[in-house]
A protein has these predicted regions:
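Active-site histidine-anchored catalytic micro-motif
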Residues: 3-262, 266, 277-283, 296-303
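Acidic/polar loop patches that form or flank catalytic/metal-binding clefts of enzymes
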Residues: 268-273
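Short hydrophobic/aromatic beta-strand or adjacent loop that forms the aromatic wall/cage
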Residues: 289-294
């Protein structure tokens, strides 16, 4: 590869999980943004869903409709890996110069992950361009990022694998803290934690509440999910780690949520559950469904 060749993260889910036609995609984004809830405080971070845009768009829009696009120079997205088994307790990162969207490119930031971490964190960063490029839990945010910021921000992406201990959570939080402090700084960086919530039904191998009346099952799932969302919003990372370690869950982004919760706790961010819903509200109701939540984090300090 020549030194001038750009490393481009190609959009693999356009025309599949969201419209690949720019004008239609703009109309779709406008619709979701018009349905978003107004949030008076300065947003610093968010936990958001990543399903196909017809499902996740409402949850994503609650954050993007309330972001000051002039306030940030950097966006970092942490997501789970759905397609590649990753080594645990490490941060799997990319080195792309640009991220493709139907609305135009988003500048990358390959230098963000490259410098060797300080002593004690060496070896915690693993190059994973291939896994990153095929991950919908990252790409589904690109249209909103491009629509909101244009080319004003630089985008960095990481996949979070299983985290085996609180020590591992804290170590990767140390690493992220160091990266951001050496980059744009906290006040100019917006963090997105990518996760859907409970996947319920035989197709997902998860039916702890049986196959009883659908409404009753949905209410029990919602109660469990809201407990998780509350612990994340309040920075109760040890409670979350205990919950995820001791009980079965199909929250696909539980490890990014753990890492984000620790990070936001350190920064003094406070979260609120802005929206909770499931796929049955957006299509034919079935016994199998996926739940989604948007949790918005704020601080009193302006970005």
């Amino acid at each position: 590869m020549s030194t001038t060749e750009l490393r481009v993260n190609r959009a693999k889910f356009a025309s599949r999980w969201y419209s690949g036609k720019p004008e239609q995609l703009k109309r779709d984004l406008h619709h979701y943004l018009s349905e978003a809830k107004e949030y008076p405080s300065v947003l610093r971070a968010a936990i958001l869903p990543h399903a196909g845009l017809s499902y996740s768009g409402y949850g994503m829009a609650d954050a993007f409709a309330n972001i000051d696009p002039q306030g940030y120079r950097k966006v970092v997205i942490l997501a789970p890996s759905h397609y590649v088994a990753l080594a645990p307790d490490l941060l799997h990162v990319e080195e792309f110069d640009s991220h493709e969207t139907p609305l135009g490119p988003i500048p990358g930031d390959p230098e963000f992950w490259t410098p060797e971490p300080r002593e004690g964190l060496a070896g915690a960063l693993v190059p994973a361009n291939g896994a990153v490029e095929m991950e919908h839990a990252l790409e589904l945010f690109f249209p909103f990022v491009r629509n909101t910021f244009g080319e004003r921000v630089r985008l960095s992406l990481a996949l979070v694998p299983p985290l085996s201990s609180m020590d591992a959570v804290e170590r990767l939080a140390d690493l992220l803290q160091e990266r951001v402090e050496r980059g744009a700084g906290w006040q100019k960086t917006f963090f997105i934690i990518s996760s859907d919530f409970t996947h319920y039904g035989r197709r997902f191998g998860y039916t702890p509440f049986g196959r009883g009346p659908r409404k009753e099952v949905e209410e029990k799932v919602a109660a469990s999910d809201v407990e998780v969302a509350t612990e994340a919003a309040e920075g109760r990372v040890k409670d979350l780690f205990r919950r995820f370690s001791e009980s079965e869950t199909t929250i696909c982004g539980r490890y990014p949520i753990l890492l984000g919760t620790e990070l936001f706790r350190r920064l003094g961010f406070r979260g609120d559950l802005a929206r909770y819903y499931n796929s049955n509200l957006l299509g034919p109701a079935t016994e199998e469904f996926v739940s989604y939540a948007s949790i918005l984090f704020t601080s009193q300090e302006a970005p």
